[in-house]
Amino acid sequence: PYTRADLDWTNKNSRSSVEMNDKSYRPQIAQLPNSLANYDTIFIGFPIWWYVAPTIINTFVENVDLDGKKVIPFATSGGSGMGKTLANLKPSCPGANWVEGKVINGMSEKALADWAEKL
């Protein structure tokens, strides 16, 4: 887990700053799912850090089999949009069918359901 100090983006020595400044860094995931074989569509949610997904999301997509699956990123953000998120995630899992993501800040449950249904 990340502490408040880990997430202090104003401190260039914080854990999140160090991770995001090294694009090759891949934090470990405690436990990956056994299989995603029963799913055709995968939603992946995360906060936007520095206009992209945190590098742990790259860890995830590089270590699960998403080939041929529709992958839909969604995010929260303190002020930016999706930025270069999709461009940064695609090389980590080129076999997935990536769909343009969406920032979902403040969306009502109905608006979120409507968005997901259209995908």
Task: Cite the ranges covered by each PLM segment.
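Short glycine/serine/threonine-biased micro-segments
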Residues: 43, 66, 77-79
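Short, surface-exposed connector motifs at secondary-structure boundaries
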Residues: 40-42, 67-72, 98-99
